[in-house]
């Protein structure tokens, strides 16, 4: 009788362990696919300028790791698809710059803090891809993603970090943009 109970306990324990392993696997698969989006054929990189100088280059989807206010940004895109990346920043002069920056040009004067940014794609890039981006500041933390030349930032609160992703239009990228910009 005792031997039978012992075998039953072992069997129940094995079943519970197998169930937990299967559950963990299922959760990892579901959560792991959350941000699996199509980015083939795109090489996006960007770096920011702070009072410490230029950061390292960040790749598609990486968060910039700087801890100081962003004073300038360069964004490059390398692809066989026809088109350019364009971007503009909102700084201390309380307006966006007069001219957009393109394909690796510096946006921002490297002296004034940036409060907002808008990023877009042109030509066939615009037809095939969306560009998502979000900014971080001490007051609001990470703002929601915005896309395709909409403003990200909080007017009057300097941007400290940025994250940029180029994603094929038919990808399943879950984002919300209820609070992507404040005061613009």
Place the predicted regions along the sequence by residue.
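Residue-level detector of intrinsically disordered/flexible regions characterized by low predicted structural confidence
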Residues: 9-11, 30, 78, 167
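Sec-dependent signal peptide cleavage junction
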Residues: 23-40
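N-terminal Sec-pathway targeting helices
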Residues: 2-19
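Lectin-type carbohydrate-recognition ectodomains
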Residues: 35-184
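Short, flexible coil/linker elements and helix-boundary hinge sites characteristic
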Residues: 7-9, 32, 53
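Generic short N-terminal amphipathic or hydrophobic helices
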Residues: 1, 9, 23-26, 166
């Amino acid at each position: 009788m005792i031997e039978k109970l012992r075998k039953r306990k072992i069997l129940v324990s094995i079943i519970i362990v197998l169930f937990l392993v299967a559950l963990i696997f299922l959760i990892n698969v579901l959560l792991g696919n959350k941000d699996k989006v199509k980015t083939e054929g795109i090489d996006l990189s960007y770096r920011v300028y702070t009072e410490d100088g230029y950061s390292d280059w960040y790749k598609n989807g990486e968060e910039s790791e700087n801890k100081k206010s962003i004073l300038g940004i360069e964004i490059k895109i390398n692809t066989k698809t026809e088109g350019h990346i364009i971007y503009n920043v909102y700084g201390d002069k309380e307006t966006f710059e007069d001219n957009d920056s393109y394909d690796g040009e510096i946006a921002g004067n490297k002296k004034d803090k940036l409060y907002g940014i808008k990023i877009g794609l042109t030509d066939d890039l615009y037809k095939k891809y969306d560009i998502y981006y979000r900014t971080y500041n001490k007051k609001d933390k990470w703002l929601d993603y915005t896309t395709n030349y909409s403003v990200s930032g909080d007017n009057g609160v300097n941007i400290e970090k940025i994250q940029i992703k180029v994603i094929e239009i038919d990808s399943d990228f879950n984002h919300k943009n209820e609070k992507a910009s404040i005061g613009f």
